[in-house]
Amino acid sequence: MIKWITRLFIVLILSQLFFLFFLSFYGVETTYFNSTIQEKVRALNPNINLEFQKTKILFDIKQLGLKIKIRNPKINVKGTSANLSKLNFGISIESLLKDEFALQNGEFGLFKTDIKQLIKIINQIKPSPFLIIAKKIFKEGKIEGVAEINFDNTGKIQDDYKITGLVSDFNAKILKKFRLSQIDSNFELI
C-alpha cells in the first residue's frame, strides 16, 4: 500500500512538472481574453483601438509569473494605424492574486512604419508641442524598433526603459538652410 501511494505521489509530481514545463515552452493560445484586453486598452485611452487575432499565455519559471504574447497586433488611433511586430507583457501571479497592479513589463515592436504616421499616432495618444514641430521638420522616412519598459507596483513606467531601432530613408528640413537627406541610422535610448 505504501509503495502504491509513493508511486502515485511521484506520478502526480512528475505530471505537474511536465505541465509547468509545457506551459513555459509552448503555452496556451486563446481568443478568450481578446475582448478584455481591448477593453482595458480603451479604458486607458478611448481613442486607441488594438486589433489582434490571438493571445498566447506562457508560464515564466524564473519570475513565477505569466508572459502574455499578443499575436499579429495592430494599433489604430483615430483612423491612423500601425502594425506591431510584437506586443508582450509580463504579469506577476502574486500581484494578480492580491488584486494589485500585476503588469511588470512590456515589450513593443514596430514594423517599418512611415515616420510621419508614427508621429501622428503618438501625438494623438499623448499630445506634445515637440511632436508638432517634429512633424513639420521631418519630411519623410521609415522607422522600426523595439521598446522594453518596466512598471512599478503602482503602474508607472520606471526609468530603466530601453528603446532600440532603425531609421531609414530619413529626410528633414531644419529652418530654410539645413537639409538632411537619405539618412540611415540605428538608435538606442536607455
Where are these regions (language model features)?
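Terminal hydrophobic membrane-targeting helix
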Residues: F19-I115, K135-K136, E140-K142, V146-D152
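Hydrophobic membrane-insertion alpha-helices, especially the h-region
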Residues: T6-F22
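Extended terminal
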Residues: M1-I10, L58
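Outer-membrane beta-barrel architecture
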Residues: F101-N105, Q158-T164
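Beta-propeller and related beta-repeat scaffolds in trafficking/envelope systems
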Residues: A43, T55, T80-A82, F89, ...
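Flexible, solvent-exposed coil segments and beta strand-coil junctions
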Residues: L66-K69, I122-L131, I163-F170, E188-I190
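Extended, amphipathic, non-transmembrane alpha-helical segments
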Residues: D114-N123
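Extracytoplasmic/ectodomain regions of membrane proteins and secreted proteins
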Residues: V41, E140, N153-Y161, N171-I174
